[in-house]
């Protein structure tokens, strides 16, 4: 096998060219001791951890496969983190999942009498540190949790970890876009090599666009409750 083909073989496991990961810093995280995330680390440079892009890609594929087994509306996607709000709303727009952004009211999963209560079969969170309420309620209800996790993320009640930068605007846009694309492919809504009509930049948080997404999401929630 030629060196060129070997290089091509090495790049094949990546969901998108490495340069895009680098542009978005989606594979970079602060250095922090976390034995659960250590296996995803490629190397450490100074005070930063570089996640293995191949392993990020593998976990996104695995998460997409798992999510594809659930009805879209029964997938609850959560983000209390500001830069995760637009990615979550866009992800739900293109996949049919149910979004919850901003503060996660106690009882959302555990109290059927609560306005805004959600019946979910699986929960996807943006960052376990700030989405702890959603994870705790999912645990009480025996609902599996998929989470994007950085080195400082608590993962005790996370069933499937997707390593990545959970703080950056571009990184969250790219991670959610990749997961949306792979989920649509798993469902057969896109062919294996087909690209969606939207790009990762469409998932990037912009306050003015977030307000429009939020209004649309509220309308969808009202229809679902009816």
Q: Regions from the language model: what does each represent?
A:
Residues 2-4, 8-10, 14-212, 224-226:
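Ribosome-associated RNA-binding proteins
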């Amino acid at each position: 096998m030629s060196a060129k083909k070997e290089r091509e073989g090495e790049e094949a496991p990546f969901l998108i060219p490495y340069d895009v990961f680098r542009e978005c810093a989606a594979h970079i995280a602060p250095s922090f001791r976390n034995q659960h995330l250590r296996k995803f680390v490629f190397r450490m440079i100074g005070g930063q951890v570089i996640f293995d892009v191949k392993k990020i890609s593998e976990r996104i594929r695995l998460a997409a496969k798992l999510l594809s087994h659930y009805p879209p509306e029964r997938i609850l996607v959560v983000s209390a983190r500001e830069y995760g709000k637009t990615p979550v709303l866009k992800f739900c727009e293109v996949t049919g999942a149910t979004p919850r952004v901003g503060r996660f009211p106690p009882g959302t999963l555990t109290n059927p009498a609560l306005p805004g209560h959600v019946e979910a079969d699986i929960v996807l969170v943006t960052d376990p540190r700030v989405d702890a309420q959603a994870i705790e309620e999912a645990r009480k209800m025996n609902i599996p949790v998929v989470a994007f996790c950085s080195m400082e993320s608590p993962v005790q009640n996370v069933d499937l970890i997707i390593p990545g930068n959970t703080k950056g605007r571009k990184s969250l846009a790219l991670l959610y876009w990749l997961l949306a694309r792979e989920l649509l492919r798993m469902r057969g809504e896109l062919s294996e090599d087909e690209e969606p009509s939207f790009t990762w930049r469409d998932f990037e948080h912009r306050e003015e666009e977030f307000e429009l997404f939020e209004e649309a999401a509220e309308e969808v929630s009202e229809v679902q409750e009816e």
